């Protein structure tokens, strides 16, 4: 837990230095000086790298450290003797005490962050037992890899997504996240000169998964679309750099195109169905948005045509080089990625066997395009696959796939690429800040993703009940109505604020709510019927009274018994109206 706190503190300090207009090398140099001071001895290059990791959990490429050390030698801060580095003025601790002070200050801040999250969890679920050490570790994982599923992930995301809680604490977390973004930009860096001038010596082809392609046009919601737009801005900026030999190419596999076409074909089959059938068939935002406004199958065909036209306009093109056919060629078997052990590990995490087959095919195709070479910088490996599927991302880090820590992974996230491209193009974090850098926005996306997954599981469970005829027709109708209500809440822009959507028994809660409303409506209908009877009798008495008025204009005669009855009816009428309105308001 202590190393976790140190790393988070160092990230915040990294961002602190960056805000002081220090360039990346100057910031790294400060940490190197602090490392050399603490070691009390001369260090070889590899030892400097090791101590940077031991002291701050910074995994910085050797080439970058070496360049930073050379700059320190030129500025007379460090000397090199027999390939070992040491501080020239080790006694002058004040010059590099800011790191120590900042990290110590953050220990208090870190405690405040954890306590705020614990308080939030207790507020929304008082029965939940929070293990502080587990929460600290999960918070660390959330900052460094928000795609990893952990015990407290949904609570951390809910805390950050909620606009009403601890804005000062969230600002501190944002500072940590910004530091992590800066460090991410240094990952898989071989040529230190590329930190200052972004060079592409050859094309880098980024293959994009179906879900992200849907995000590009807004099928998954406006927030996802905005993040993809940030990605496009950075790609276009890189491609406009003069004298670059290579370009960033955005492509999708023919297999991905087939999946997209099948998706639209499914939408064609759904669009003309009844509303109940649509509820039974639609379980994600993309399908809901494709169906929105569509009445006939031809409307879906038109949307599909417009979608592929949109991709072409953004220069996102199909790669029809028949990579899949090449990977099954016996001459390319060495690039196939598969072992029984990695399959077992994949299935043990609760994943589907069919997904394993699809994912290993993607990994193998990228490996084939790279010709099996994943060492070096990201820009020089030639290809990478972009996805938001956590199961595929985890598989790409399996030890049988990702053999060396320095290897560039075959698959990554759009967040990583945005971080990388933003860093490499030296965008100032205050002038151009991609939406994915905002921890509150990212948290909302994570919460919505968790809610959508819960809804999908709920949908699958209900579908299974339908197929197996496990329940009566009335029960099924009631569950479908409940499912529709939940679906509307899930697709709402503020779904992340609805904590009940996380409940495992959300369907039962919604059904009970519907039943309760039905009973209330029945009661109100009974009241309304009583009012109708009272109004009818009152109307009859009024007519009789008017008749008496006409019969005897000088003297209005109403029998005492009828007058009493009329007064009683007036009272009953007024009292029932009050009860009627009261029940509606309640």
Label every model-predicted segment:
Residues 387-389:
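Active-site proximal loops enriched in glycine and acidic residues that flank catalytic Cys/His/Asp
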Residues 2-35, 45-47, 51-56, 62-82, ...:
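Active-site-proximal, substrate-binding regions of enzyme catalytic domains
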Residues 559-586:
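Hydrophobic, helix-forming membrane-interacting segments
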Residues 41-42:
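Gly/serine-rich nucleotide phosphate-binding loop at the start of the catalytic core
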